[in-house]
């Protein structure tokens, strides 16, 4: 039978088929997307304009992506079975010491959110902005003797990226085992030659991808946003920086770049290594070498590495923000480059204001993603009307992800206050319970607030109607950004 592609019936059948596929996809979204906002944000366009939304849904949708989540959980189980013979997690004493500490109660439910326990006797150091961060990371790698683990969302083949590449090549030539993991989507601009040079020099480097095989190119929504460096099991780093010149303030439109990292030593480094091992095992089906020191210090601060991701049994990242806000009795200060809270987190912020808590959120004054910036602006205006003090950082782009609760609890890591970090990305955050370290974080944030402009009720009223329309459209699609 010959199909006449110029027949009006052909186009009628084609449109009917597209609308039928749109209905099927909308039903799939309703059954698989975890949140009502996200389900509606997908289902309505799929029903009414499927010819514009079917392909984006194939690429960005299918939130629960059950096949992937099942495979990821299975890989994690296999990895932990493989680790069983390593006498890993020998932190019983540090975990018991943490639980017996008076500071432990300040975390409330937070220690139960993650797979890894809160541990005592750690040392932490605040690293403010790119120079301090990469000076410390490079100095630590320079002294490496056994194993270096490096994981970033973005690696650029620029001045900083090349400096890291040369340093890792030099250490590999000295006999150090070097492992590098980067996200395939975040590092999409990284040329294959960058990785090949490292491989030729003895460095093991792999891209983190959601799935193996050709279909992976159509599934870009799950991204590994973690930033982890561990050297010899003795010194580690996590925070907001990626590897690129812009993180040193070399991007004219976004400079100076404001970001925060933290340097860590102590038993919690075992947790950072375990998080890296899970991602490395998923990418390679092999375990990297994991190192434990012979002894730990007898004193230090309470820390917990909170790793989160779409394969978790619960929405770990959003629950962390909820519990951090709910637990605040005096203040909760949050800095994030994106401010797209879901209904629960927004309600928690509103309730904290009603309890008399000093609630402040610091966001950028310059956009790096215009749609996300527009959505963030509308949420910021609504937060101001709810009594939250919202600030825009003025000197340059703000990329740090920091939470300060009352006088003891701080969190520094890779997680943003948005739907992507809540439900789509793999993230890692370091929770620290220590008044001295919290004082340092407070001083750092106080300086940031002094360089910020507070958003006022007048700002919300002076916005042009076209801008308001754009913000509302951006907010409508924010659950799928």
From Swiss-Prot:
Any one of the GO BP annotations: cardiolipin biosynthetic process
GO molecular function: cardiolipin synthase activity
Active site residues of this protein: 225, 227, 232, 399, 401, 406
Regions that span the bilayer: 10-30, 40-60
Chain ranges of the PLD phosphodiesterase domain: 220-247, 394-421
Keywords on record: Cell inner membrane, Cell membrane, Lipid biosynthesis, Lipid metabolism, Membrane, Phospholipid biosynthesis, Phospholipid metabolism, Repeat, Transferase, Transmembrane, Transmembrane helix
Main subcellular localisation: membrane
Compartments, as annotated in UniProt: Cell inner membrane
Protein role: Catalyzes the reversible phosphatidyl group transfer from one phosphatidylglycerol molecule to another to form cardiolipin (CL) (diphosphatidylglycerol) and glycerol.
PANTHER family in the cross-refs: CARDIOLIPIN SYNTHASE (PTHR21248), PHOSPHOLIPASE D (PTHR21248:SF22)
Protein name: Cardiolipin synthase A
Gene: clsA
